[in-house]
């Protein structure tokens, strides 16, 4: 029986199969190993992938892109608000949930993701010639519980049995067998993922086959689309210079340039120059322009600077120098860019830069290997050779009340806490109250707390009123998969309540 791994990115999706002791990415019906995560809705059907991307110019208001950015989010979430503002599809809130309004029909982000997962399932089944149900799905390190659950629900709706959600950096290490090739000794690995809409960097300690995440950081202001946009702006300037028309305010013309710039960007990863030709770009005028790799690197110089500064910042955060890193793993389609690879080599001149697996295939391959391990059919010894110690991606906070009855937040699991982990906290509540509600929140960085951050609550009722304070002992245990068990006990009476917050895996 084969197992598969699926990576649903913001801009692309990819499926890999683990069979006969080997993991490999499978091509879709167009012969491409990576599928655009784009869904177009027409009068008669839903179109997924390259065809949807290519037809977007003619069907922009009915074509959904970057659905991953809104999965599991609600209005008021800064990421969701940014997405809604930029989306060409109308996004509305109905019954407390964000949905696309397309041709007077409401379509949830989960339904869009389901169509992409269905495409991945069809792709894998076509390659194998048999049904595939069991899957491991990758998630970004900073995904919250709501986002994980939404992703898992979408995959299940597509007919998948989701065996596990695995963090993307963990999948990257599995793909290269890091920790298995050197079962003894200690090393530090930096996983560098430059995807379509974000840059994620993670430092992982590998010690005798045990993997522990030391630090991670994600920047949503750097990604492949930003390189494409920079090149498209340059092309618009060239068109204005040669044809005397400024098309920057024309969405249709700029979308055509974005498509051309995207193709050119990919070509420049292997070629010294690329041709950008757009038929009838504006007012019947064709556009034809050559861009050299050197020119592209100059146009995107500020983006390249951000890409390397992010590495230095994370190393400083964890107290490392470049010499403390033993290996660098490249992930994400934009990590193919030669200039970026050279800049990373300049930071780590004596470090092995792992890029033998195409960067946009590393993560799904690792997920497929994990799927094979979980099925236990192909190479069960792998499970004994590598143990991941995951860590909490976000701060987990407990909201209670202080002696004066005011809200008070206490960080119990700071982001980066190795899992599994256990914490306990004694909350002091006014003795005049007969019930205490403790709410759990998750946060990244120093963002202000609001209702959008709450993911669970526990209520301790029927407390005996008393002079002084109630002492409520709260014990939280977070497992490796991110699930959280919480118990609250009144120290005076022993009255206890407990909840478990499961994850989609």
UniProtKB/Swiss-Prot annotation:
It is found in: Cytoplasm, Cytosol. Keywords: ATP-binding, Chaperone, Cytoplasm, Nucleotide-binding. It comes from the Eukaryota. This is Heat shock 70 kDa protein 14. The keyword tRNA-binding does not apply. It holds the Pfam family HSP70. It comes from Gallus gallus (Chicken). Belongs to the heat shock protein 70 family. GO terms for cellular component: cytoplasm; cytosol; nucleus; plasma membrane. The keyword Chaperone applies. GO terms for molecular function: ATP binding; ATP hydrolysis activity; ATP-dependent protein folding chaperone; heat shock protein binding; protein folding chaperone. Component of the ribosome-associated complex (RAC), a complex involved in folding or maintaining nascent polypeptides in a folding-competent state.
